[in-house]
A protein has these predicted regions:
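Transmembrane alpha-helices and adjacent helix-loop boundaries
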Residues: 1-380
Length: 380
């Protein structure tokens, strides 16, 4: 198993940079006080944690789109489902500290004059159960959807449209107050997690470390998959599904496994996202979020995994910077960026880096060969 990841120098270099910045941020937040030049505020800790959640989400999509060849335009739905499960757990930890002081019901249910907790909220207040549901809920949806779609041999643009319809339908359902997930406002006003204040600097630091660890583990698992025999079959399905099917492989089972595994990673990313940003609402199901996710992967570079990390962090950092300067034009710029990358940089940022390295290597080989040719000419 070690042999499947030991040669991934580029990927581990990217992860090394991630951990380096995590360390710098944590040191700046803990060793220095507000007003110092090197002080890093809690907002920066939260912001970088959010970037890493997006990076894990992008890696999960790259596995599905880059290696399996399925362009899922509803992948953010799994992210949102994992986030909602974590939000439900955090809401159950509030107890009598809510506005209405009701230990049995969240505030929004009391406000809507509900008298009992819905059955699907049972047990979610226990962390081990919530942890299982964070993975199980997205996996179940992905399994049911994928089984029906892949068995029916739906593919290409039709599958992309169906995935987008799925996340749109979920958004409509979660916007309704009757579903018991907070309606438009979603779930918020969290107090603590595992008994620790969710707003304390220490908790934020630990959440950042947990997110970086989840990204690292998720990346390694994806790398093991794509470098294994399973991964080679998956890539073959992407390149020519009919040939793989003709050989005798049950293509739908391979597609289903990758689709479900990607959904689980997305759910974990969503669960780590919620306690750091302090809210989860139906807006996370917005199809635009899934389209933005595709752009992150495209900008970084498809079918590389580490390119998805670079793209997610790069695009979201740019979004943070430019939305303050050009708040109305940012979405247009993002769309233009996707078009330009698709037309001129099909391999994304990592493709540009590889081209630059190749040119430098060619130049170096040319320089080394010049003296030899000169000496041969002189002897001639």
């Amino acid at each position: 198993m070690v042999s499947l990841v030991k040669n991934d120098k580029k990927g581990f270099s990217v992860l090394g940079f991630v951990w380096f910045f995590v360390l710098l941020i944590l040191l700046g937040n803990s060793l220095f006080s507000e007003g110092d030049t090197l002080y890093v505020g809690s907002n920066t800790v939260t912001l970088f944690g959010k970037y890493l959640c997006y990076a894990l989400l992008a890696v999960s999509l790259d596995l599905i789109w880059g290696y399996l060849g399925i362009l899922s335009l509803g992948h953010a739905a799994f992210f949102a489902l994992g986030g909602y499960v974590m939000g439900m757990y955090l809401m159950r930890q509030i107890g009598t500290r809510g506005v209405y002081g009701n230990a049995e019901l969240p505030d929004f249910m009391v406000f809507l004059n509900w008298h009992e907790l819905p059955w699907y909220w049972y047990g979610v207040g226990h962390f081990p159960i919530a942890l299982i549901l964070i993975m199980l809920v997205p996996a179940t949806l992905a399994f049911v959807f994928g089984f029906l779609a892949f068995k029916s041999r739906v593919g290409g643009v039709y599958l992309s449209i169906i995935t987008q319809s799925l996340t749109f339908a979920l958004a409509l359902a979660f916007y309704r107050n009757e579903t018991g997930f907070g309606g438009n406002n979603g779930l918020t006003d969290f107090k603590d997690i595992l008994g620790f204040s969710i707003t304390s600097n220490t908790t934020r630091d630990v959440l950042l470390i947990c997110t970086a660890a989840a990204l690292t583990i998720g990346y390694i698992l994806c790398r093991i998959i794509v470098n294994s025999r399973l991964g080679r079959v998956v890539v073959a399905i992407r390149d020519s599904e009919s040939r793989v099917r003709f050989i005798g492989y049950h293509v739908e089972y391979f597609k289903l496994f990758i689709f479900v595994f990607g959904a689980i990673l997305a759910g974990i990313a969503g669960a780590l996202y919620v306690p750091q940003v302090g809210i989860i609402n139906p807006g996370e199901f917005n199809p635009i979020n899934s389209i933005e996710l595709v752009i992150w992967v495209a900008v970084g570079g498809r079918a590389s995994l580490y390119g998805a990390i670079i793209g997610a962090i790069l695009v979201n950092y740019s979004k943070t910077v430019f939305t303050g300067v050009f708040p109305d034009e940012w979405l247009y710029a993002l769309g233009l960026l996707f078009v330009l990358v698709t037309l001129f940089l099909p391999k994304g940022v990592i493709g540009v880096i590889d081209i630059i390295k190749a040119k430098k290597a060619d130049k170096g080989d040319g320089d080394k060969g010049t003296p030899v040719e000169t000496k041969e000419a002189e002897h001639a």
